[in-house]
Amino acid sequence: AGEAPVLAQMQIGMLGIFADADQLVDLQKFVDEENYDMSDFMPGLLDASYYDGALVALPHSRSVPVLYYNKDRFKEAGLEEAPVTWDDLKADAKALTGNGSYGYSCPLDQWYYMSLVMNAGGTIFNETEDGIGFAGDPGTKPLYLWKEMIADGTMHVPSGQDYNSSEACRNAFAGGTAAMIQQSSAQLKGLEKTCEFEVGVGAVPQDTTLSYPAGGSNLLMFKGHSEEEEKAGWEFLKYMTNTENAVR
């Protein structure tokens, strides 16, 4: 107690709190010392590892919202591809609803809501980062989309909150009572193991823009440790984020 570890895996939403408190090591010094190649990191994920110009983390265990769909049910309904637009989503969900099954299921969760907000042209913060970026249509259109689909009986709202709601959503998919679900890309392997049908993966349908809020966690290094510990920590960070380990 009272002593931070050398390294930690941290949810990206918490990164700024510790960086603002000057608790994190700027990893750029290690990158510069050995001319470490950073090109293998996806730019969009790497951007979320910087705070006020300092490289305070490396991407690890990152994910984005995706649309999973039951390929068998799609074939039975005469559908060939995952829906691309919100209109496609509504039409496909209607075609897939019936016999005790909903066409679509999604937790009423802020992360999945924000994915629809961004696909409607909104952002979490405005350009000056002193207010929200989803006032007006980008913020309300996703809610009206959900409201319409729930009223039409084509959208299942899983019970519970947070992770419980997501688990209920995945159970509905695996059990055949939801043909499409919006979940994290991190759930792919688990769904492939539990579902007795072929699982398809598509982008979250868009309204005006194809854009998503990346989630997951980063690896970081805390200040307050010896030079030897920092160097050992850097070696472990490289090991954990190299291509071979990242794709496992």
Positions of PLM-derived features:
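Alpha-to-beta junction loops
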Residues: 2-10, 23-25, 99-102, 174-183, ...
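Extracytoplasmic/periplasmic substrate-recognition and gating elements
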Residues: 76-77, 152-155, 192-248
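A ligand-binding cleft/hinge motif common to bilobed small-molecule-binding domains
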Residues: 15-19, 182-197
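Short, solvent-exposed loop/beta-turn-alpha elements that line the ligand-binding surface or hinge
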Residues: 28-41, 122-143, 193-194, 206-212
